[in-house]
UniProtKB/Swiss-Prot annotation:
Keywords noted in UniProt: 2Fe-2S, Cytoplasm, Iron, Iron-sulfur, Metal-binding, Oxidoreductase
Annotated residues for binding of [2Fe-2S] cluster: C3, C6, C18, C25
Record's protein name: Hydroxylamine reductase
Lineage: Bacteria, Pseudomonadati, Pseudomonadota, Gammaproteobacteria, Alteromonadales
GO cellular component: cytoplasm
Length: 554
């Protein structure tokens, strides 16, 4: 086992990364190794998908399967060995079909196919022990003693960044948003990673390509969500329980939430969002369901306590899942799509009757708690509608600075930095937030500036697209570069979606971003220095020091 993809990975003087019997996330060594083997096989699929396009063959299932299966290897998504093996075998099958099609097409055209990496032809073993033995050749740090540490760091940066983009591609696909051009670029990069390049410059260029790719993916996902559910609008949301039977929907999948709401109509069940599903309550389409009563709980890392206390059924539509046996609720949590946990019921298709039956069999909430309202829904359209008022308040001096404070949440005590930072921002500034990092401060009162709320909840982590669009609009109004705006980005990271959003911002030329609470363990000091020199990327220090530096206070 070697895994170094998330913020909570082991860090020691002897080296970084989880490389023992179990990772910090609870992932067993065998599961980690099987995920590495799956990624290896997916690189082989992409290698042939690239060849197929070069030969003029039509797109295949690989365009959707590879990103989806890649998503399954994201932090806190799938811990089920059998499901991972199933994905790997399907990858082998798809690859073999593509290989045959390409070979036949090349023969007809009189073209000689160049050799491809081993992942394009290796045959999987028939047993789990054989697969685990094969996985030794798929470790992400394979050959680390023979190549420069910066090259290894760049490989991992690209791998984890592309993994984040794959997750957003799958979210978009669920909403019937796909692009042949995006799929082609994804396969190109995936196939390139399969060559194990030692060219640092080429790897750095590909990292920026991944950022550019993800910007297009986020735009596609934004289109999918708004086409299906309307544009989010400022909305008051209750964060306290309501009396009655209950279902909790966590993850990111709005389509699953819609299906659950339709199937629970008239059944006396209240539905709650959790974690990154909170923004759903701001979409017009969901407001037709009175039994969508609010948001329960907070960010992913608190689920073992929150789910244990939730007296109903829970559905995990995507990341993040952690061991449900700790809180003894494994018998009433259900997984969907790419999510998996051994022994937990996995739902295929669109029938949620098992969830409904479980919810009806449970006690539910016995009484209403006193309502506590928070405001959400300041996504792209709402921000653009508010832009004239924002511009006027900037011009008259009422608004002097913008802060984007958000990203991933996590366990570490150091993450209290983001709570303290938000609380310390001056009263003449606006705070934009997104992702589950918002839970560090989204129930606090920040007041308003001439009717404009100081705290503007943009939405899910992928709604960084909305923040980018606002920054572009403001830069056009003020006729300046984005980096000349009074805008500072302070981002918390945990996993691979955050990595690709960072790459997206860097690829767009956004500079002077602060990230925390710690730098990615897979990045070397030298590479961090390159990112600082080229983009002004900095790690968070203390709230006082960072705010003083941002606001040029001596």
């Amino acid at each position: 086992m070697f895994c170094i993809q998330c913020e909570q990975t082991i860090r020691t003087p002897a080296g970084n990364g989880c490389s023992y019997a179990q990772g910090m996330c609870g992932k067993l060594a065998a599961t980690s190794d099987l995920q590495d083997l799956l990624i290896y096989m997916l690189k082989g699929v992409s290698a042939w998908a690239v060849k197929a396009r070069e030969l003029g063959l039509p797109p295949t299932e690989a365009d959707t399967f590879v990103p989806k299966a890649f998503f399954a290897t994201l932090t806190n998504v799938n811990f089920d060995d059998e499901r991972i093996i199933e994905y790997a075998r399907k990858a082998e099958s798809l690859r073999n079909v593509l290989k045959t099609q390409c070979t036949e097409a090349a023969q007809k055209a009189g073209i000689r196919l160049e050799s491809l990496p081993d992942s394009a032809s290796v045959l999987l073993g028939t047993s789990k022990p054989e697969l685990l033995e094969q996985a030794k050749a798929a470790l992400p740090n394979l050959g680390k003693d023979d190549i420069h540490e910066d090259v290894m760091a760049l490989r991992l940066l690209c791998l984890y960044g592309l993994k984040g983009a794959a997750a957003y591609m799958e979210h978009a696909r669920v909403l019937e948003q796909q692009s042949a051009d995006i799929a082609a670029e994804f396969h190109r990069i995936m196939a390139f990673l399969g060559t194990d390049s030692v060219d640092a410059d080429a790897l750095f260029t590909v990292a920026m390509d991944i950022g550019q790719l993800n910007f297009k993916v986020m735009a596609m996902l934004d289109e999918g969500e708004t086409a299906a559910f309307g544009h989010p609008e400022p909305t008051q949301v209750n964060t306290k329980p309501v009396k009655g039977k209950a279902i909790l929907v966590s993850g990111h999948d709005m389509k699953d939430l819609e299906l659950i709401l339709k199937q629970t109509q008239g059944k006396g069940i209240n539905v709650y969002t959790h974690g990154e599903m909170l923004p759903a309550l701001a979409y017009p389409e969901f407001k037709q369901y009175p039994h969508l009563v609010g948001n329960y709980g907070s960010a992913w890392q608190n689920q073992q306590k929150e789910f244990a206390n939730f007296p109903g059924a829970v559905v995990m539509t995507s990341n993040c899942i952690i061991d449900p046996n700790v809180g003894q609720y494994a018998d009433r949590i259900f997984t969907r799509s790419i999510v998996g946990w051994p022994g937990v019921v996995h739902l295929e298709g669109d029938d949620f009757s098992a969830v409904i039956e479980k919810a009806l069999s449970l006690e539910g909430f016995l009484y209403d708690e006193i309502s506590h309202q928070i405001t959400i829904g300041f996504a792209r359209n709402a921000l653009m509608a508010a832009a004239p008022a924002v511009v006027e308040n900037v011009k008259n001096g009422s608004i002097r600075h913008f802060f984007l404070v958000g990203g991933c949440d996590g366990d570490k005590a150091e993450r209290s930095y983001f709570t303290d930072f938000a609380k310390a921002t001056p009263n003449d500034s606006l705070i934009l937030t997104l992702g589950c990092g918002k839970y560090k401060f989204n129930k606090l009162e920040f007041g308003d500036i001439n009717g404009i709320p100081r705290l503007l909840d943009i939405g899910q982590c992928n709604d960084a697209y909305s923040a980018i669009q606002l920054a572009i609009a403001l830069s056009e109004v003020f006729e300046c570069d984005i980096n000349e705006l009074p805008l500072s980005l302070v981002l918390s990271w945990f996993e691979q979606k955050a990595i690709v959003i960072l790459l997206t911002l860097l690829s767009l030329g956004v500079k002077n971003i602060r990230t925390g609470p710690t730098p990615p363990a897979f990045l070397t000091p030298n590479l961090l220095k390159v990112l600082e020199d080229k983009f002004g990327l900095k790690n968070t220090t203390t709230v006082e020091a960072d705010l003083n530096a941002i606001l040029n206070v001596a």
